[in-house]
Amino acid sequence: MATVIKNGTVYQNGRLIKADVLIEGKKIKAIGTDLDAEKIIDAQGMLVSPGLVDVHVHYRDPGQTYKEDIKTGSEAAARGGFTTVGAMPNVTPVPNTPELMKKMVEENKHKGVVHIFQYGPITNDETTDIIPDYAALKKAGAFALSNDGHGVQTAQTMYLAMQKAKENNLIIATHAQDDSLFNKGIVNEGVAAKKLDLPPVTELAETTQIARDLLLAQKTGVHYHICHVSTKTSVELVRLAKARGINVTCEVAPHHILLTDSDIPKDNGYFKMNPPLRNKEDQAALLVGLLDGTIDLIATDHAPHAKSEKQGGMKNAAFGITGSETAFSTLYTKFVKEEKVLSLEQLLALLSDKPAKVFGIENAGVLEPGKNADVAIFDIEHKNEIKEADFKSKGVNTPFTGQKVYGETVMTLVDGEVVYQRGTK
């Protein structure tokens, strides 16, 4: 049965247009005016967007399914308007063999309600210097490589990894962190560390590893992608590298542009994340980086934890913040609706077509005839409160609970099928 989404404002190819979207089967059939079908979805006053693309999520499955699993994580993505995600490999066991990778890919397809692309690890268990068989992992379904949560500590290991990744046309996506400089820190070296008397994290833990890796990327020619850049110096390093022709891309997480360490009101585990919230100068530089193209995309780093793991103060709390269900609404409210730092078109590009393009994900992040019918419909005119009770994720570890925001997801379709609808369980 054909479906038409009528009366909405459609984001297509960088523009907002008044149009209808006709869906037949799993594909978009047409975008235009006065389209008709047996089933009509009225999007009057709504934004009709390509399904958003999040290249950085943690689903904890297998190994830590009390925090999240593929089903709940993908349902959370759908509730946030995301229809394509990249799942990090920090699960147990790490998918470091073709057999384990094939199993992960099959589980993602079977249990997930959105399209899930699976990362393979850069090193065998994400902390050793042993490099797995990238060719075999790619053949088994790995779409990129990452040790997210861990930096690759030795330059030699990263150099070899980049060479092998280049040979196999795989992206290296890194969590840039020198553990000797991170030194068991908790919050950014700044106001919160002093106020709360917590171990500080120097920005050098991030920036020195980025500088090292950029030189290695220049030598090898690999596509080097930096996860969740968080400092002014990181942005400057990437800007310089791009000017020199190094094949580098990077992402920023919503919380690093929405919050700073000055926003941490007390010793609250919901504000503990890695990289930590930085200062206002860093935040401003991240926004400039988004606007001038130094930062290529926004990715949530959705990192759910059990409530018990975020209680008892920041020293004992786990690192991480959920993001799938709050990203679009919080970003739209602050940067488009209120502060007018970004246009709606710019925000949507950073959350849809740009991440798909950077990672070479075909059929994602665009609304065009012949492409997958992956669509998100947002209510951008009315405010709604972020409530724990509404979350699909098992993790409610976010400091944004209680905020009133515009941009709630009304409906999400994947391959033409409704996978989320506001007001339904």
From Swiss-Prot:
Pfam families: Amidohydro_1 (PF01979). Keywords: Hydrolase, Metal-binding, Pyrimidine biosynthesis, Zinc. Binds 2 Zn(2+) ions per subunit. Substrate binds at residues 58-60, 90, 274, 305, 319-320. GO terms for molecular function: allantoinase activity; dihydroorotase activity; zinc ion binding. The keyword Lyase does not apply. Pathway: Pyrimidine metabolism; UMP biosynthesis via de novo pathway; (S)-dihydroorotate from bicarbonate: step 3/3. The active site is at 301. GO terms for biological process: 'de novo' UMP biosynthetic process; purine nucleobase catabolic process. Zn(2+) 1 binds at residues 56, 58, 148, 301. It catalyses: (S)-dihydroorotate + H2O = N-carbamoyl-L-aspartate + H(+). HAMAP family: PyrC_classI_B. Catalyzes the reversible cyclization of carbamoyl aspartate to dihydroorotate. This is Dihydroorotase. It comes from Lactobacillus gasseri (strain ATCC 33323 / DSM 20243 / BCRC 14619 / CIP 102991 / JCM 1131 / KCTC 3163 / NCIMB 11718 / NCTC 13722 / AM63).
